[in-house]
Amino acid sequence: MAAPAARADGSDAALAAALADVPDLGRLLEVDPYLKPYAPDFQRRYNRFSQTLDNIGKNEGGIDKFSRGYESFGVHRCADGGLYCKEWAPGAEGVFLTGDFNDWNPFSYPYKKLDYGKWDLYIPPKPNKSLLVPHGSKLKVVIRSKSGEILYRISPWAKYVVRESGNVNYDWIHWDPEQPYKFKHSRPKKPRSLRIYESHVGISSHEGKIASYKHFTCNVLPRIKGLGYNCIQMMAIMEHAYYASFGYQITSFFAASSRYGTPEELKELVDTAHSMGITVLLDVVHSHASKNSEDGLNMFDGTDSCYFHSGPRGTHDLWDSRLFIYSSWEVLRFLLSNIRWWLEEYGFDGFRFDGVTSMLYHHHGIGASFSGDYHEYFGLQVDEDALTYLMLANHLVHTLYPDSITIAEDVSGMPALCSPISQGGGGFDYRLAMAIPDKWIQLVKEFKDEDWNMGNIVYTLTNRRHLEKCIAYAESHDQALVGDKSLAFWLMDAEMYTNMSVLTPFTPVIDRGIQLHKMIRLITHALGGEGYLNFMGNEFGHPEWLDFPRKGNNESYHYARRQFHLTDDDLLRYKFLNNFDRDMNKLEERCGWLSAPQAFVSEKHEGNKVIAFERAALLFIFNFHPSKSYTNYRVGTTLPGKFKIVLDSDAAEYGGHQRLDHNTDFFSEPYEHNERPSSLLVYIPSRVALILQNVDPPN
């Protein structure tokens, strides 16, 4: 990142004041002295967070109580069989409950107006003590607006909504089963190394339909476990009316999407994953919300300012969605309670926060090209209300469950976003290394293999802030969306339809694609971060792209599925890529390179197209040259002794050409090479990745 020029307010007095206010700010500035001119910014951010937390304590009894909004808001069965209902609708003139239970009479059950825009209602049980509103009943909140308009709404706190065939809008279903799912398994401990399988339940079947929670539990979870992933990131779980939005236009924030099944079936999915030792993260969308009003948050009380900024500030120009007003007390309650709901009710172990860049800046990242100059991350362009909310959310998550994980999707690279709150940071555990997939797509689209720049690859993979952990990935769901395509399809394209059979010889295109696909994944895994992510299906080189059913494709599910049968077919070459992914993950589990300090890169040779580095006492060697193999190639190492091959992309089980003898012993000698005290001689075939392990170090 570019070093910033000193600011006028970076005086010694301002620095001293900031250090006095922010407990561990000195540690952050020790790691990155270039942040010293911005110490007052960290001071202000930390003080805003602390003051908000104090205000919550004084007015609400603490964040623990404040984040339990779902226990009172919405509709709840009381111990006596009655019903307690509560809503926040500051712009309403009247609020009512209607539904099956009263034959949809809109006004027979009025709420009582409370302070601060809140309304509540108690409905006693029937004389025989039976439930007036049984499980499965349809409900609506009726709002009388200030203009006199009568509006039918779904409660923002609704736990379950469904859309019946033929209906445009969702129906709110009172979810109160007699026998709710009981969790059987404890949460796994926080993984030392995070290997994430990014998943979407709906597309997890090879059939042209929306798959179910049950299908995912029975068919996909065992695959994930077998591949060596220890974490699932679940997309599109929060209810969204438009399936093709990929889950990013949320309409009901407390409802698990009913298109895949029931809330209890999602709980079973999470519990089953826990039984396998798999951590489960939710892709949480608190950066914006759907514009839908009849089955969404928008215009809930008849005004455009209930949960969102009013006027133009409340609309995202690119996403055509509503933007939360994070300074609002009740919006904070709603969002923090939403975070807690998913942790407590469904057993999720943390979150990947979507759209963090949009939250952090008033410009939402629109038209902003972040150069790395520190001025871009401070000052008036930063939405400090949103940043305060994110700090509160991270504080809540890590206070409730210290082993929980939070990941920020931020393309801007904001410094200290993944530093502890006590340092003035955002409190996230990880950020996504979003430049890495862009680099791979750029290389395969725009450059010949012989023109790939080794130094640029290494720079992209290692360009991350010290002590702020990154999740590296070669491709996620973003890279496969319609208009783009999977990495395997960029490499092999239409030949994947005709030349993936093991009964036919390798074509040059398929050979190149399979070898590079393995190398790209391994170097990303080993060099790119402190965690690794793979989108479902890409472990075996899923062909084509993702396109959800919509009018533009005649509502087709053809590209909204994952063709797992391809890797299960022993006569197809997809199995080779799948085998490599499995063994790469299982070797990382044994050796722990993701949790080791950043690698020392000893070689990035442009002419030879060779990259070599050490991490976790392993020696990684990559030869990206399309045709040149090297005999007795000298590679530097810190470790003396005997080395063996522990992973070889050229092995037969990975679709390689078997040019290496795995019985070979490699001995390093005290011959300095590339700033390493020892070195060894290795045969490196073309387009091959090797990992050597020191198996017999001298005393």
Swiss-Prot record:
A GO term, aspect molecular function: 1,4-alpha-glucan branching enzyme activity
GO cellular component, one term: cytoplasm
Matches recorded under Pfam families: Alpha-amylase (PF00128), Alpha-amylase_C (PF02806), CBM_48 (PF02922)
Pathway annotation: Glycan biosynthesis; glycogen biosynthesis
Residues annotated to bind substrate: N59, E60, W88, A89, P90, D115, Y116, G117, K118, E330, V331, L332, R333
Disease implication from the record: Defects in GBE1 are the cause of glycogen storage disease IV (GSD-IV). GSD-IV is recessive fatal fetal and neonatal disease in American Quarter horses.
Family of this protein: Belongs to the glycosyl hydrolase 13 family. GlgB subfamily.
Name of the protein described by the UniProt record: 1,4-alpha-glucan-branching enzyme
Organism of origin: Equus caballus
